[in-house]
């Protein structure tokens, strides 16, 4: 079975600056709680109060609890953290300590070239934050998908701390055959890590690429309603 994570509110927030009406959110949760979606990524948690970003970039514990109650018991609630806002493990511990027992999963979108820095932060944070599952989204797949050795090296670095990694076509430029060939190799060579995918729709191929990755053995896929999201 392929696990589905819907990130409509989080990724769709790039269109609305994370402002969503209560009515829209209510209708969204009425629908998503009935769909075969395993995990719902509802936005960001952030201590950065600059700018005019809406509630779904600055989610608080009370609101997250309310959202979680609208999901099925077997659905997990997830949030993204803007890795650029985290300078050290103390920042991350301070931020996440407010959400233990509320958030099931946090994800970081990380440039593979900076993986060591963020893995060190996550490793230290996990010693204090025990009830949240940490995952990484590896960005810029189109830049390095031809280099299987590089991809395996990055995934191997993550293995002891991260059990699930989503590979992200940040520019939405990959083609289905490229996706199939890459995921066929990378999944078969990393059987102890759950490999997921996240495709952007710049070329109108996000759905086709997702299906190609699943056909190649990818075990987790990100989705949004109507393809709403960055790119």
PLM feature spans:
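Short, well-ordered coil/turn segments that N-cap beta-strands
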Residues: 1-2, 36-38, 72-77, 101-104, ...
């Amino acid at each position: 079975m392929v696990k589905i994570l819907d990130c409509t509110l989080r990724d769709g927030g790039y269109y609305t600056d994370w402002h969503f009406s209560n009515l829209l959110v209510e209708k969204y949760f009425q629908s998503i709680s009935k769909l075969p979606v395993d995990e719902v990524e509802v936005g960001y948690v952030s201590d950065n109060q600059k700018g005019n970003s809406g509630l779904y970039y600055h989610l608080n514990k009370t609101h997250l609890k309310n959202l979680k109650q609208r999901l099925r018991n077997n659905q997990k609630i997830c949030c993204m953290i803007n890795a650029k806002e985290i300078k050290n493990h103390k920042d991350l511990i301070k931020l996440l300590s407010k959400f233990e027992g509320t958030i099931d999963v946090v994800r970081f979108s990380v440039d593979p070239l900076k993986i060591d820095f963020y893995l060190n932060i996550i490793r230290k944070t996990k010693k204090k934050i025990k009830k949240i599952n940490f995952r990484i989204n590896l960005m810029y797949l189109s830049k390095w998908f031809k280099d299987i050795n590089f991809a395996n090296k990055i995934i191997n670095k993550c293995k002891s701390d991260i059990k699930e990694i989503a590979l992200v076509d940040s520019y939405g430029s990959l083609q289905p055959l490229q996706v199939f060939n890459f995921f066929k190799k990378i999944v078969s060579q990393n059987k102890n890590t759950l490999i997921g995918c996240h495709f952007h729709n710049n070329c109108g191929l996000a759905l086709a690429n997702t299906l190609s990755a699943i056909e190649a053995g990818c075990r987790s896929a990100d989705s949004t309603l109507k393809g709403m999201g960055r790119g």
